[in-house]
Amino acid sequence: MKPFEASKLPIEYSLDKELISLISEANLKYGEYKSNLKNSQFDSRFFLDSIILSESLKSTQIEGTQISQDDMYYLKYMPKTDDNLEIQNLKEVIEYSKNYLKENNKITIKFLNNIHKILLNSVRCNEKEPGKLRNIQNWIGPRGCTIEEAIFVPPVPEDVPILLENLFEYMNNAYIDPLFINLAISHSQFETIHAYRDGNGRLGRALIPIQLALLTEDEPILFLSEVI
């Protein structure tokens, strides 16, 4: 199988009535969610801390992490296993990004490398050059499969920096496409590029609330790993 040749963004697309209705409903529900957080009688930070921790658990469970919902509240007191560290690292990525967005108004390759390094810190993928864009051809498929047996082969490594720069131009612009369309296309493009040797899925899922916070000038408050 040959490496995929990714198109640059923005792309042309069409929406049917059903999708337009769903996007309108999503915007409405998101507005209600933000309003409820803002007008809540309790400190929403405690709620968001729990949501961020739950998101970290859900995202890493997709990758096979064996930590239960009950265990996640006691991670600080549990042995430092790879599963434990992966959840804590993902939570740290969100916290780091919240602070980054207070002083920066765009996502960059440097920022992406930094959060990828945090994500893979001291875990089983640590030998796969955390914080560095891949310089080899990777592919997706059953464990141990060859490139010929792959389900998908991402773009060649030489194209990764160019495609990321183009992606970030799109991600950082709130006016090219409607908000949730921008998020969906950005997520799809990031996973298509598969910029790192490992951790692309977790990083891609983390970028959704980060990009949403950037475009709405808010904190990361919407996490979608459970439904992706």
Description of each model-found segment:
Residues M1-I228:
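FIC/Doc superfamily catalytic core
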